[in-house]
């Protein structure tokens, strides 16, 4: 649907993002903005308008950044165009936030007036300040009886270090004070700079694949303008495409026919090649190929690797296509083909964390209708061989033999944790259990900010869940990779009837290996169905067996027909049965159910 484009002077445009910790009310505030500026009629309104993915609505979290263009009339009578981007709050998606911020001049830092500042709001806020944005703190949930605005304003100034005495307060749920937030943001956030008459220069902030339209790109126009029918040039590929549609989301997909400097909107050029318009690339017109490329985004490195395999081998090609389509939309996803003796052909995928992995697997299963099975996730280890070569190990099967390795190193994460004083002891105990080393501690009002260096393998698994449960949900975490450090690491193999099962192997610290091995074989014992012969499950480090359990055979009562009978007759029948079971064991193979592969993930420490 096309509509007459309102031409707004560049000084009346405001581009901003909303950043906050999980559950501090970003998406609800976005809903209120849309409602007040008449983006949608009341009947079209629903909670979390911008979280369009089913998964986002179910879990109540934002995964993808979404952009919206609204028109707002200020009390001074001027009309402003607001382009805002709703960003995710979860630590696994912080790269989405930094991408969104590149398109803005300002950011609204939403803080829950009852909960106060949390680690993720601090991390995202620093990202915004580094990129030179104007940060406007806002206190949300002011209608709650437990809201303490004075304490929270003090916390924002203490912990983050930005002026917050005049921070607007609002309740996104009831709509109280939201008008004031809009007024303040128009006054505080600077207008974009750019020359509408200069040659076109635009940054691709995000892109996704539509089966009918091809690649849809979300762009921020720095200079110049782009119209429907223009011939555009993608700088990195050097290819030209005819623009078929240009417009904005308000939040409905609305064609406007032209986008001008300072604006954020979508461009569709019928690009069918999945890699035709990479995120972070610059587009210009084919008549001005000399326009400089804008600085893109730094590539994010995956922190967790896991094998994903289709249950049905014939799904391998559709699976590859699905991953490629998902990768346009999710630049942090990495994958390469892998084969496993136990699971067949699949892909080794790299993710930013466990939540990211879960989301990707769930999106593949829902949106592309695939049945997938995953192997145990591992982090990337660094090994130095005796010849002096450095190799990176992202899967236990790639672990070289101990005789050729000089040094094994594991990744260390720097974790910043914010926790109320009364839970400090529990959190410290948890960090030390996870082989953490304390680096710093600051008391800020009622909150304590602690910094630990913890091995990445301990952080990405279930550290976040454990941290939440030992602090009743009050602690918050932000972490980033800092370096590799030498460590005593071993590979634990799982043998079933003497044969190694590659998909069940894991790499862990030598001190943990024994009890993790025992816990794993005990768990496997419950999950592998009983066979007609004994099944031995063993955990081994190299040639040394560290744990064993046996799934007992099902057996028929061969003595049932003997009644009184002679004892030697009974012995003969039992010996015959034993002989048969032995023969069966030599030729029998054991089916391992999917749950058994997942057991590796769930082994408690």
Curated annotation (Swiss-Prot):
Residues 11-193 form the tr-type G domain. It catalyses: GTP + H2O = GDP + phosphate + H(+). It is a peripheral membrane protein. InterPro entries: EF-4, EFG_III/V, EFG_V-like, EFTu-like_2, G_TR_CS, LepA_C_sf, LepA_CTD, LepA_IV. GO terms for biological process: positive regulation of translation. One of its GO terms (molecular function) is ribosome binding. Pfam families: EFG_C, GTP_EFTU, GTP_EFTU_D2, LepA_C. The keyword Signal does not apply. GO terms for cellular component: plasma membrane. Its EC number is 3.6.5.n1. It is found in: Cell inner membrane. Its main location: membrane. It is an enzyme of class 3 (hydrolase). GTP binds at residues 23-28, 140-143. Keywords: Cell inner membrane, Cell membrane, GTP-binding, Hydrolase, Membrane, Nucleotide-binding, Protein biosynthesis. NCBIfam families: lepA (TIGR01393), small_GTP (TIGR00231). Belongs to the TRAFAC class translation factor GTPase superfamily. Classic translation factor GTPase family. LepA subfamily. Required for accurate and efficient protein synthesis under certain stress conditions. May act as a fidelity factor of the translation reaction, by catalyzing a one-codon backward translocation of tRNAs on improperly translocated ribosomes. Back-translocation proceeds from a post-translocation (POST) complex to a pre-translocation (PRE) complex, thus giving elongation factor G a second chance to translocate the tRNAs correctly. Binds to ribosomes in a GTP-dependent manner. HAMAP family: LepA. This is Elongation factor 4. The gene is lepA.
């Amino acid at each position: 649907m096309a509509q007459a484009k309102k031409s707004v002077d560049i000084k009346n445009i405001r581009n901003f993002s909303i950043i906050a910790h999980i559950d501090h009310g970003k998406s609800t505030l976005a809903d209120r903005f849309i409602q007040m500026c008449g983006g949608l009629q009341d009947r079209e309104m629903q909670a979390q308008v911008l979280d369009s993915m089913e998964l986002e609505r179910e879990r109540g979290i934002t995964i993808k950044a979404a952009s919206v263009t609204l028109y707002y009339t200020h009390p001074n009578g001027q009309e402003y165009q607001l382009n805002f981007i709703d960003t995710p709050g979860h630590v696994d998606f912080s790269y989405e936030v930094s991408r969104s911020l590149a398109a803005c001049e300002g950011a609204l830092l939403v803080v829950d007036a009852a909960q106060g500042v949390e680690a993720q709001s601090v991390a995202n806020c620093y990202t915004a300040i580094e990129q030179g944005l104007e940060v406007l703190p806002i206190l949300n949930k002011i209608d709650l009886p437990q809201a303490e605005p004075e304490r929270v304003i003090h916390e924002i100034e203490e912990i983050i270090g930005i002026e917050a005495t005049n921070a607007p307060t609002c309740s996104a749920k009831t709509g109280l004070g939201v008008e004031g937030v809009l007024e303040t943001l128009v006054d505080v956030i600077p207008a974009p700079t750019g020359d509408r008459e200069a040659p076109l220069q635009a940054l691709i902030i995000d892109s996704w694949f539509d089966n009918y339209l091809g690649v849809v790109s979300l762009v921020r126009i720095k200079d110049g303008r782009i119209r429907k029918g223009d011939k555009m040039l993608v700088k990195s590929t050097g290819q030209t495409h005819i623009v078929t549609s240009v417009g904005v989301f308000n939040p409905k997909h609305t064609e406007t026919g032209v986008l001008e400097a300072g604006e954020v909107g979508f461009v569709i050029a019928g690009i069918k090649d999945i890699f035709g318009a990479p995120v972070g690339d610059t587009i210009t017109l084919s008549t001005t190929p000399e326009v400089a490329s804008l600085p893109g985004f730094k590539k994010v490195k995956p922190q967790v690797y896991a094998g994903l395999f289709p249950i049905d081998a014939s799904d391998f090609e559709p699976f590859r296509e699905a991953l490629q389509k998902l990768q346009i939309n999710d630049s942090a996803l990495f994958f390469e083909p892998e084969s496993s003796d136990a699971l067949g052909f699949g892909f080794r995928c790299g993710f930013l964390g466990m939540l990211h992995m879960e989301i990707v697997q769930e999106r593949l299963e829902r949106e592309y209708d695939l049945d997938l099975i995953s192997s145990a996730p591992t982090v990337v280890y660094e090994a130095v061989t005796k010849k002096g070569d450095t190799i990176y190990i992202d899967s236990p099967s790639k672990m070289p033999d101990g005789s050729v390795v000089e040094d094994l190193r594991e990744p260390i994460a720097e974790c910043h944790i914010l926790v109320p004083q009364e839970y400090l002891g529990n959190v410290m105990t948890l960090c030390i259990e996870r082989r953490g080393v304390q680096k710093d501690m600051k008391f800020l009002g009622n909150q304590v900010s602690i910094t630990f260096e913890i091995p990445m393998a301990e952080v990405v698994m279930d550290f976040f869940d454990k941290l939440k449960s030992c602090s009743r949900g009050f602690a918050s975490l932000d972490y980033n990779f800092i370096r590799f450090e030498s460590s005593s690491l071993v590979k634990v193999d799982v043998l079933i009837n003497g044969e190694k099962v590659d998909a069940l192997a894991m790499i862990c610290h030598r001190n943990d290996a024994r009890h993790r091995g025992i816990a794993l074989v005990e768990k496997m014992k419950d999950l592998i169905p009983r066979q007609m012969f004994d099944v031995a499950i063993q955990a081994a480090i190299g040639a040394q067996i560290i744990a064993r359990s046996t799934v007992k055979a099902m057996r028929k009562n061969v003595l049932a027909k003997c009644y009184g009978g002679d004892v030697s007759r009974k012995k003969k029948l039992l010996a015959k049965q034993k002989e048969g079971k032995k023969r069966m064991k030599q030729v029998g193979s054991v089916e391992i159910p999917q749950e058994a592969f997942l057991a590796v993930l769930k082994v408690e420490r």
